Protein backbone atom coordinates (compact mmCIF):
# COMPACT_ATOMS: atom_id res chain seq x y z
CA UNK A 1 0.00 0.00 0.00
CA UNK A 2 2.88 2.37 0.88
CA UNK A 3 6.00 1.03 -0.90
CA UNK A 4 8.18 3.87 0.40
CA UNK A 5 7.41 3.13 4.07
CA UNK A 6 10.13 1.88 6.43
CA UNK A 7 9.30 -0.87 8.94
CA UNK A 8 11.30 -1.14 12.17
CA UNK A 9 11.31 -4.28 14.32
CA UNK A 10 12.83 -4.23 17.81
CA UNK A 11 13.53 -7.84 18.76
CA UNK A 12 12.52 -8.63 22.33
CA UNK A 13 11.19 -5.15 23.08
CA UNK A 14 7.75 -6.39 24.21
CA UNK A 15 8.40 -9.66 26.01
CA UNK A 16 12.15 -10.12 26.10
CA UNK A 17 14.10 -12.89 24.37
CA UNK A 18 13.97 -15.75 26.90
CA UNK A 19 11.61 -18.35 25.38
CA UNK A 20 11.63 -20.54 28.51
CA UNK A 21 10.00 -18.11 30.95
CA UNK A 22 7.12 -15.68 31.27
CA UNK A 23 4.82 -14.75 28.43
CA UNK A 24 7.55 -15.52 25.89
CA UNK A 25 7.42 -19.27 26.66
CA UNK A 26 4.09 -19.50 24.81
CA UNK A 27 5.95 -18.74 21.60
CA UNK A 28 7.40 -22.25 21.46
CA UNK A 29 4.22 -23.88 22.78
CA UNK A 30 2.16 -22.29 20.00
CA UNK A 31 4.72 -22.65 17.20
CA UNK A 32 3.44 -26.06 15.90
CA UNK A 33 -0.18 -24.86 16.13
CA UNK A 34 0.68 -21.79 14.11
CA UNK A 35 2.47 -23.86 11.45
CA UNK A 36 -0.50 -26.24 11.10
CA UNK A 37 -3.02 -23.42 10.83
CA UNK A 38 -1.10 -21.49 8.17
CA UNK A 39 0.54 -24.39 6.30
CA UNK A 40 -1.49 -23.84 3.13
CA UNK A 41 -0.87 -20.09 3.06
CA UNK A 42 2.88 -20.60 3.58
CA UNK A 43 3.23 -23.48 1.09
CA UNK A 44 4.69 -21.25 -1.62
CA UNK A 45 7.08 -19.42 0.70
CA UNK A 46 10.81 -20.06 0.45
CA UNK A 47 13.11 -21.12 3.25
CA UNK A 48 13.82 -18.62 6.00
CA UNK A 49 16.78 -16.29 5.35
CA UNK A 50 17.23 -17.55 1.77
CA UNK A 51 16.71 -15.16 -1.16
CA UNK A 52 15.05 -12.41 0.92
CA UNK A 53 15.15 -9.99 -2.04
CA UNK A 54 12.83 -12.32 -3.95
CA UNK A 55 10.75 -13.56 -1.03
CA UNK A 56 9.71 -10.01 -0.18
CA UNK A 57 7.78 -9.79 -3.47
CA UNK A 58 4.72 -11.85 -2.58
CA UNK A 59 1.37 -11.64 -4.31
CA UNK A 60 2.81 -11.24 -7.81
CA UNK A 61 2.63 -13.45 -10.89
CA UNK A 62 6.14 -12.65 -12.09
CA UNK A 63 8.88 -10.03 -12.45
CA UNK A 64 9.62 -7.70 -15.36
CA UNK A 65 12.78 -5.61 -15.72
CA UNK A 66 12.46 -2.32 -17.63
CA UNK A 67 15.67 -0.87 -19.07
CA UNK A 68 16.02 2.57 -20.67
CA UNK A 69 18.84 5.07 -20.99
CA UNK A 70 17.51 7.14 -18.07
CA UNK A 71 14.57 7.46 -15.68
CA UNK A 72 11.43 8.69 -17.48
CA UNK A 73 10.36 12.26 -16.71
CA UNK A 74 6.68 12.04 -17.55
CA UNK A 75 6.06 15.80 -17.63
CA UNK A 76 8.97 16.52 -20.00
CA UNK A 77 8.40 14.43 -23.12
CA UNK A 78 5.95 12.06 -24.79
CA UNK A 79 8.33 9.11 -24.62
CA UNK A 80 8.62 9.38 -20.85
CA UNK A 81 4.85 9.67 -20.51
CA UNK A 82 4.44 6.52 -22.62
CA UNK A 83 7.04 4.72 -20.50
CA UNK A 84 5.06 5.49 -17.34
CA UNK A 85 1.87 4.16 -18.88
CA UNK A 86 3.62 0.99 -20.06
CA UNK A 87 5.01 0.37 -16.57
CA UNK A 88 1.56 0.90 -15.04
CA UNK A 89 0.04 -1.52 -17.55
CA UNK A 90 2.53 -4.26 -16.68
CA UNK A 91 1.92 -3.66 -12.97
CA UNK A 92 -1.84 -3.92 -13.50
CA UNK A 93 -1.30 -7.41 -14.93
CA UNK A 94 0.17 -8.51 -11.60
CA UNK A 95 3.90 -8.21 -12.26
CA UNK A 96 6.55 -6.72 -10.01
CA UNK A 97 8.41 -4.07 -12.03
CA UNK A 98 12.06 -3.14 -11.59
CA UNK A 99 13.47 -0.17 -13.51
CA UNK A 100 17.15 -0.10 -14.50
CA UNK A 101 18.35 3.20 -16.03
CA UNK A 102 21.42 2.80 -18.20
CA UNK A 103 23.04 5.84 -16.58
CA UNK A 104 22.15 4.62 -13.04
CA UNK A 105 21.27 8.22 -12.14
CA UNK A 106 18.82 9.12 -9.39
CA UNK A 107 16.58 11.84 -10.84
CA UNK A 108 15.17 13.21 -7.62
CA UNK A 109 11.39 13.41 -7.55
CA UNK A 110 11.07 11.43 -10.80
CA UNK A 111 12.84 8.45 -9.26
CA UNK A 112 10.94 8.93 -6.00
CA UNK A 113 7.60 8.95 -7.84
CA UNK A 114 8.43 5.64 -9.53
CA UNK A 115 9.36 4.08 -6.20
CA UNK A 116 6.18 5.35 -4.56
CA UNK A 117 4.19 3.60 -7.30
CA UNK A 118 5.78 0.28 -6.30
CA UNK A 119 8.59 0.16 -8.87
CA UNK A 120 12.02 -0.87 -7.62
CA UNK A 121 14.56 1.53 -9.17
CA UNK A 122 18.23 0.55 -9.46
CA UNK A 123 20.64 3.48 -9.06
CA UNK A 124 24.16 4.40 -8.02
CA UNK A 125 25.89 4.28 -5.55
CA UNK A 126 24.22 0.96 -4.72
CA UNK A 127 25.13 -0.35 -8.17
CA UNK A 128 28.03 1.03 -10.18
CA UNK A 129 27.46 -0.67 -13.53
CA UNK A 130 24.51 -1.95 -15.48
CA UNK A 131 26.44 -5.07 -16.43
CA UNK A 132 27.19 -6.07 -12.83
CA UNK A 133 23.51 -5.76 -11.91
CA UNK A 134 22.52 -7.97 -14.83
CA UNK A 135 25.18 -10.54 -13.95
CA UNK A 136 23.77 -10.89 -10.44
CA UNK A 137 20.04 -10.37 -10.96
CA UNK A 138 18.99 -10.92 -14.59
CA UNK A 139 17.99 -14.48 -13.72
CA UNK A 140 15.35 -13.11 -11.30
CA UNK A 141 13.16 -11.85 -14.15
CA UNK A 142 10.59 -13.51 -16.39
CA UNK A 143 10.81 -10.77 -19.03
CA UNK A 144 12.98 -7.77 -19.86
CA UNK A 145 11.47 -4.70 -21.55
CA UNK A 146 14.15 -2.64 -23.32
CA UNK A 147 13.51 0.80 -24.81
CA UNK A 148 15.78 2.01 -27.66
CA UNK A 149 18.05 -0.07 -29.86
CA UNK A 150 21.29 1.42 -28.50
CA UNK A 151 20.28 0.39 -24.98
CA UNK A 152 19.61 -3.10 -26.32
CA UNK A 153 23.09 -3.16 -27.84
CA UNK A 154 24.53 -2.70 -24.36
CA UNK A 155 22.31 -5.24 -22.61
CA UNK A 156 20.92 -8.08 -24.72
CA UNK A 157 24.07 -10.22 -24.67
CA UNK A 158 24.27 -9.97 -20.87
CA UNK A 159 20.59 -10.88 -20.52
CA UNK A 160 20.90 -13.89 -22.82
CA UNK A 161 24.00 -15.05 -20.93
CA UNK A 162 22.59 -14.72 -17.42
CA UNK A 163 18.83 -15.14 -17.97
CA UNK A 164 18.26 -17.39 -20.99
CA UNK A 165 14.72 -18.08 -19.76
CA UNK A 166 13.68 -14.39 -19.86
CA UNK A 167 11.70 -13.10 -22.82
CA UNK A 168 13.15 -9.90 -24.28
CA UNK A 169 10.73 -7.21 -25.48
CA UNK A 170 12.18 -4.35 -27.52
CA UNK A 171 10.35 -1.05 -27.79
CA UNK A 172 12.49 1.04 -30.12
CA UNK A 173 10.35 4.14 -29.43
CA UNK A 174 10.66 4.93 -33.14
CA UNK A 175 12.81 3.67 -36.00
CA UNK A 176 15.70 6.10 -35.94
CA UNK A 177 16.86 5.29 -39.45
CA UNK A 178 13.43 6.12 -40.91
CA UNK A 179 13.38 9.49 -39.18
CA UNK A 180 16.94 10.22 -40.35
CA UNK A 181 16.15 9.07 -43.90
CA UNK A 182 13.13 11.36 -44.14
CA UNK A 183 15.26 14.24 -42.87
CA UNK A 184 18.02 13.52 -45.41
CA UNK A 185 15.49 13.37 -48.26
CA UNK A 186 13.87 16.61 -47.10
CA UNK A 187 17.29 18.31 -46.90
CA UNK A 188 18.43 16.77 -50.21
CA UNK A 189 21.55 15.46 -48.48
CA UNK A 190 22.50 12.04 -49.95
CA UNK A 191 25.89 12.15 -48.19
CA UNK A 192 24.16 11.06 -44.99
CA UNK A 193 22.82 7.83 -46.50
CA UNK A 194 25.83 5.69 -45.52
CA UNK A 195 25.47 6.62 -41.85
CA UNK A 196 21.72 6.03 -42.06
CA UNK A 197 22.28 2.54 -43.48
CA UNK A 198 24.55 1.78 -40.53
CA UNK A 199 21.84 2.86 -38.08
CA UNK A 200 19.29 0.77 -40.00
CA UNK A 201 21.48 -2.32 -39.78
CA UNK A 202 22.02 -1.83 -36.04
CA UNK A 203 18.31 -1.36 -35.37
CA UNK A 204 17.31 -4.40 -37.40
CA UNK A 205 19.97 -6.50 -35.68
CA UNK A 206 18.56 -5.65 -32.25
CA UNK A 207 15.00 -6.23 -33.43
CA UNK A 208 16.01 -9.67 -34.66
CA UNK A 209 17.78 -10.42 -31.37
CA UNK A 210 14.65 -9.67 -29.31
CA UNK A 211 11.75 -12.09 -28.78
CA UNK A 212 9.11 -9.42 -29.40
CA UNK A 213 9.23 -5.96 -30.98
CA UNK A 214 6.69 -3.22 -30.27
CA UNK A 215 5.97 -0.44 -32.75
CA UNK A 216 3.66 2.54 -32.55
CA UNK A 217 2.51 2.85 -36.18
CA UNK A 218 1.81 0.86 -39.34
CA UNK A 219 4.87 2.15 -41.23
CA UNK A 220 7.25 0.85 -38.57
CA UNK A 221 5.23 -2.33 -38.18
CA UNK A 222 5.68 -3.08 -41.88
CA UNK A 223 9.47 -2.85 -41.48
Located regions from the model:
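Active-site proximal beta-strand in glycosyltransferases
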Residues: 162-180
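N-terminal subdomain of nucleotide-sugar transferases
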Residues: 54-112, 116
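Catalytic beta-strand/loop signature of glycosyltransferases that borders the donor
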Residues: 1-11
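C-terminal, non-catalytic tails of nucleotide-sugar-dependent glycosyltransferases
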Residues: 16-63
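Membrane-proximal helix-turn-helix segments that form the acceptor-binding/catalytic region
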Residues: 176, 192-212
Amino acid sequence: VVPSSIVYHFEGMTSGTDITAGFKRHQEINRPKFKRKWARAFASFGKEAQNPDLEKDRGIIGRVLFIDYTTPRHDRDAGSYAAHREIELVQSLGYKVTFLPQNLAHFGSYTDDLERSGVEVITAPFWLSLQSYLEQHAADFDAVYITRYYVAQDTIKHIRAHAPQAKIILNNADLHFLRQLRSAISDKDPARLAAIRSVRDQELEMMTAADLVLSYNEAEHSV
